[in-house]
A protein has these predicted regions:
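N-terminal mitochondrial targeting presequence
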Residues: 1-48
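The feature marks the mature, well-folded catalytic cores of soluble enzymes
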Residues: 31, 38-353
C-alpha cells in the first residue's frame, strides 16, 4: 500500500530528532535533539495559495496529496493488485534476494505467471484488505491491470515484468510530492506504467510529480560475481558493505525510505545504492534531511519489516535485525519497541526480505 493523504491536523512536520552526520553513508558523528515543530510552521511553504498563473503556482490548498510521516490517520491510499503477476527472470539481482532452495523455481518459471492458485489467494486477500479500508472510510485507489508476461527489450537488457502488487516499493510521498523510484530489478523497469493514471490525476489536483533518473540497468549496475550461497555468506557481505547493486548509476526502491516529518531515514540495500541515496538527499534538500542507517541484516531490502517509525519518537525495531545506530535514537529520547519473534515461520516466503 501507499499512503497518499493523511488528515491535515497531524504531525506532518514533526521532528523527533536531527542527525548531524559526516559524509553520506558513514557513521554519524553527532546527534542533536530537536523539539517538535508545529504543523503550521513545517508545512507553510507546502500549502501556499495558488497564483493566477497555474504553470508557476504553488501547491493549492485542496491538493489531494499531503503526507509527511508514517503514523497520521489515513484518508486515502493506493493498494496494489496481484492480477497477471509473473515470476521474474532469474537474473543476478533476483538471485541475490531469494533463498537458494527456491532458485529452481525461478529457473523453471521465470518469465511465466505465478501458479494460478497462488494468484487467486493473493487477489482475494488484497480485495478483502480494500474492503476493510473502505469500511473504515478510507478512499482506495488501484493501479491498472497490465499483462506482465509481455517481454520488453532495451539496448542493455531484455526481461518480462513482475506485478503492481506493491506501490510502496515504487512510489514515495513526501509532503505534496509524489516521487517515482527508479527501481533496481530489471523485471520492475516498467512497473510505473500501472500507476500513471493515478499519478496524473493527483498531478491535475495539485500534487508535485517527480520521476527519479531511470537507470539503464546495464550489466555494470550489478556485481555479476556476487557470491551468495548461505546465510553466513550474506551476513559477511552485508557487514562489509557489499551488495549485488554497484555504484554504476543511481538506483533505489521507495520502500528503503521511511519518513518522520523533515527527517527521512534510509538504508543501503540490495536495491538502493549510495548514488540513489545521494540523488534523493540533493533533491529534497534543504527542506528535508536524509539519514543513512544500517542493520545486522544478511540481505537488506526494504526497511519497513526491519525498522518502522510508528509515532513521534516511537520506533518499532525488528529484534532479528538490530539497528547499528539505535543508541543515537535512545539518546535523543526516542522510545524503541522490540516486538516478540513471530510464531509463523519465514520458510514459506520466496524472498529473503
Amino acid at each position: 500500500m501507499l499512503r497518499v493523504r493523511c488528515l491535515r491536523g497531524g504531525s506532518r512536520g514533526a521532528e523527533a530528532a536531527h542527525y548531524i552526520g559526516s559524509r553520506l553513508g558513514r557513521v554519524f558523528t553527532g546527534w542533536v535533539q530537536r523539539s517538535f515543530q508545529s504543523t503550521q510552521a513545517a508545512t507553510a511553504s507546502q500549502n501556499a495559495c495558488a497564483a493566477d498563473d497555474k504553470a508557476t503556482s504553488s501547491v493549492p490548498k485542496d491538493c489531494l496529496v499531503c503526507s509527511y510521516n508514517e503514523w497520521d490517520p489515513l484518508e486515502e491510499v493506493i493498494v496494489g493488485r496481484a492480477e497477471n503477476a509473473c515470476v521474474p527472470p532469474f537474473s543476478v539481482e533476483v538471485k541475490a534476494n531469494t533463498y537458494e532452495k527456491y532458485w529452481g523455481f525461478y529457473q523453471k518459471f521465470g518469465g511465466q505467471s505465478f501458479p494460478k492458485d497462488h494468484l487467486k489467494k493473493a487477489i482475494a486477500e488484497i480485495e478483502e484488505m480494500c474492503n476493510i479500508l473502505k469500511r473504515e472510510g478510507v478512499i482506495v485507489k488501484r493501479p491498472d491491470p497490465i499483462d506482465w508476461s509481455v517481454k520488453y527489450k532495451t539496448p542493455d537488457f531484455e526481461s518480462t515484468g513482475m506485478y503492481a502488487a506493491m506501490p510502496r516499493d515504487i512510489l514515495l510521498v513526501v509532503g505534496s510530492e509524489i516521487i517515482e523510484a527508479p527501481m533496481a530489478w530489471r523485471a520492475r523497469f516498467f512497473e510505473y506504467r500501472a500507476y500513471r493514471r493515478i499519478i496524473k490525476d493527483y498531478f491535475n489536483h495539485g500534487a508535485k510529480w517527480t520521476t527519479a533518473p531511470k537507470p539503464t540497468m546495464a550489466d555494470e549496475l550489478y556485481d555479476q560475481d556476487y557470491p551468495i550461497r548461505s546465510v553466513e555468506d550474506r551476513h559477511k557481505l552485508a557487514a562489509q558493505g557489499k551488495f549485488v547493486t554497484t555504484e554504476f548509476e543511481p538506483c533505489f526502491d521507495a520502500a528503503d525510505f521511511i519518513r518522520a516529518g523533515r527527517d527521512i531515514f534510509v538504508q543501503r540495500s540490495q536495491v538502493t545504492n549510495y548514488m540513489g541515496i545521494e540523488w534523493m538527499r540533493r533533491h529534497l534538500a534543504p527542506d528535508y534531511r536524509v539519514h543513512v542507517i544500517s542493520f545486522k541484516d544478511p540481505n537488506p531490502m526494504h526497511i519497513d519489516a526491519t525498522f518502522n517509525i510508528i509515532g513521534p519518537g516511537l520506533v518499532l525495531s525488528n529484534p532479528d535485525r538490530p539497528c547499528h545506530q539505535i543508541e543515537l535514537f535512545k539518546k535523543a529520547g526516542w522510545t524503541v519497541i522490540r516486538p516478540p519473534v513471530p510464531l509463523i515461520p519465514d520458510e514459506g516466503s520466496f524472498s529473503c526480505v
